[in-house]
């Protein structure tokens, strides 16, 4: 019996071992089959991707080094925008691909390609890159303009579009804008009456800064005292200088943006500049914002008077504040920074061009006199009829853009543009410089000719929907307030022309129309001598 039991046990054990061995072999075979299947799928995907890239290659561009790509050349060739445009000229292309680290940078100078990207595929290119500068300015991506695509961007974009820059708000704040335009005129009057030279760059930047501060905070100055002639205080000058410093480095091809492991080493010096400029702006903004939030919470303020009040008072579905202080502060900083550079640059260049071409200046003043007369100053209600003045501004936007490129648009997935493969994560740079000077689009592109923008059948507008040049950017990431930009820019130029005759100081008769070596601004600030053009009793006084 024991022998039988033993034999039975041996058989059971052998059977069990056999089953176990069979099971293990089955599992192993299954795993091998799955692994082989996965390998084939990956191989097929690689082949498909390779086939796709053969069918749709990357845009033309240099090969670059492993890992770093063209970063050595980027560091060697400054400013980078001139290097990129010279590369495109050498390659004879209107779309290129330059790899910086692992990022494909895609500059575009062709309106047709630009429309394909920003009109036909706008949603796909709706994101922003993650950069050190943008992280600092946006307080960790809590804003709208420079925040990558996602729920936070959609939330802030909705707030700005429905509550801040809607037509009703634009009309509501008309009187504030009008007062700032009168203040500009009074400030210029005082300088001209005192025979002071007028630095047009200084004046135009501070007018734009005053206008946006007035709309945002209800005041044009950060100082308790004001200058008697209407000019900015030392505090306002420090704020404006920090703002333009920050603007210059918001997107400046910082090496750590393409090689993130270098963040903190600050090899370009960009990180320190951004921290310091942002801190100066915060120094002036944050106390006002904190005090205003406290007033609303304590019931000491109940009336909405400016944009800051709107941000604080917006409620969510539960009746609670929709925005936190950590969202309000960087959003206000972002909007304040977005206002001054484009209008002030366009007006400075426009007047410089007109000093050299007095026939254009004469036509502009003739139009203002015809539309407005000489018994009152131009107002926003006159803008629709000032077509030649607006044509001058359009031409300044075209030929003398404030920046070489728009902020980068990041591709959310692989796509094809103009027959080229654009990988996910690519940064598309729409070239203001290249679009406006494209000889395939513009005849005699380097000449300043406002007449090219006139159309007898329709009113001239500052927006350019066909992307032949950039005035205010378009699409999901476009300028949120073209109406405000139009009002500020047109009123500034119209008041400068209507109220004053301008000439160069001394014996000079021509402006040297040269761009700065490191950006797109006029190489030297435009300094002029003015003369009153209207009856003295029409000029407003500083309040």
Swiss-Prot record:
Q: Could you tell me which cysteines form disulfide bridges?
A: none
- Which membrane topology describes this protein? Single-pass membrane protein
Which Gene Ontology BP terms does the record give?
camalexin biosynthetic process; defense response; defense response by callose deposition in cell wall; defense response to bacterium; defense response to oomycetes; glucosinolate biosynthetic process; indoleacetic acid biosynthetic process; induced systemic resistance
Q: Which residues does the annotation say bind heme?
A: 479
Gene Ontology CC terms, in alphabetical order:
membrane
- Transmembrane residue ranges: 22-42
Provide the alphabetized UniProt keywords. Heme, Iron, Membrane, Metal-binding, Monooxygenase, NADP, Oxidoreductase, Transmembrane, Transmembrane helix
Q: Highest taxon of the source?
A: Eukaryota
EC identifiers of the protein: 1.14.14.156
> What single Pfam family name could you report for this chain, choosing any that match?
p450
**Catalytic reaction list:** L-tryptophan + 2 reduced [NADPH--hemoprotein reductase] + 2 O2 = (E)-(indol-3-yl)acetaldehyde oxime + 2 oxidized [NADPH--hemoprotein reductase] + CO2 + 3 H2O + 2 H(+)
Where does it reside?
Membrane
Q: Which cofactor does it need?
A: heme
> Mind telling me which PROSITE patterns this protein's record contains?
CYTOCHROME_P450 (PS00086)
Name the principal localization, coarsely classed: membrane
Drop me one GO molecular function for this one. heme binding
Q: Which family would the database say this protein is a member of?
A: Belongs to the cytochrome P450 family.
**Functional description taken from the UniProt entry:** Converts tryptophan to indole-3-acetaldoxime, a precursor for tryptophan derived glucosinolates and indole-3-acetic acid (IAA).
The protein's name in its UniProt record: Tryptophan N-monooxygenase 2
């Amino acid at each position: 019996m024991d022998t039988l039991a033993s034999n039975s046990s041996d058989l059971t054990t052998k059977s069990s071992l056999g089953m176990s061995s069979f099971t293990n072999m089955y599992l192993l075979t299954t795993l091998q089959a799955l692994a082989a299947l996965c390998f084939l799928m990956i191989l097929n995907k690689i082949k498909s991707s390779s086939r796709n890239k053969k069918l749709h290659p990357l845009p033309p561009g240099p090969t670059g080094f492993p890992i770093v790509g063209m970063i050595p050349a980027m560091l060697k060739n400054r400013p980078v925008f001139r290097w990129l445009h010279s590369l495109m000229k050498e390659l004879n292309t209107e779309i290129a691909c330059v790899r910086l680290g692992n990022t494909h940078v895609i500059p575009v100078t062709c309106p047709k390609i630009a429309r394909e990207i920003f009109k036909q595929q706008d949603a796909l290119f709706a994101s922003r890159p993650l950069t050190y500068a943008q992280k600092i300015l946006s307080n960790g991506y809590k804003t709208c303009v420079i925040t990558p695509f996602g729920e936070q961007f959609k939330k802030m974009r909705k707030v700005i579009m429905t509550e801040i820059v809607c037509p009703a708000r634009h009309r509501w704040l008309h009187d504030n804008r009008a007062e700032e335009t009168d203040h500009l005129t009074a400030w210029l009057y005082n300088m001209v009456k005192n025979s002071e030279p007028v630095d047009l760059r200084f004046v135009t930047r501070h007018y734009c800064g005053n206008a946006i501060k007035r709309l945002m905070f209800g005041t044009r100055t950060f100082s308790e005292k004001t200058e008697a002639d209407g000019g900015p205080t030392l505090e306002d000058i420090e704020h404006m200088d920090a703002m333009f410093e920050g603007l210059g480095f918001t997107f400046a091809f910082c090496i750590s943006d393409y090689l993130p492991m270098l963040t903190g080493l600050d090899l370009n010096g960009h990180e320190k500049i951004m921290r310091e400029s942002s801190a100066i702006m915060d120094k002036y903004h944050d106390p006002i914002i904190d005090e205003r939030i406290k007033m609303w919470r304590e019931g000491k303020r109940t009336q909405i008077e400016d944009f800051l009040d709107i941000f604080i008072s917006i409620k969510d579905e539960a009746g609670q504040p929709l925005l936190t202080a950590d969202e309000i502060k960087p959003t206000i900083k972002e909007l304040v920074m977005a206002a001054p550079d484009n209008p002030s640059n366009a007006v400075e260049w426009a007047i410089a061009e007109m000093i050299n071409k007095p026939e254009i200046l004469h036509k502009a003043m003739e139009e203002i006199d015809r539309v407005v007369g000489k018994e009152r100053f131009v107002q926003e209600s006159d803008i629709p009829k000032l077509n030649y003045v607006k044509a001058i501004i359009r031409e300044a936007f075209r030929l003398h853009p404030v920046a070489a490129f728009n902020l980068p648009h990041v591709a959310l997935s692989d796509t094809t543009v103009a027959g080229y493969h654009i990988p996910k994560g690519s940064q598309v740079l729409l070239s203001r410089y290249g679009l406006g000077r494209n000889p395939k689009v513009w005849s005699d592109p380097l000449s300043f000719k406002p007449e090219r923008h006139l159309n007898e059948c329709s009113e001239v507008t500052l927006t350019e929907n066909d992307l032949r040049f950039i005035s205010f950017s378009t699409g999901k990431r476009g300028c949120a307030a073209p109406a405000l930009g139009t009002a500020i820019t047109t009123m500034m130029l119209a008041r400068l022309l209507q109220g004053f005759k301008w000439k160069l100081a001394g014996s000079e008769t021509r402006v040297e129309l040269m761009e700065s070596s490191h950006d797109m601004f006029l190489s030297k600030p435009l300094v002029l001598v003015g003369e009153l053009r209207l009856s003295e009793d029409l000029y407003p006084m500083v309040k």
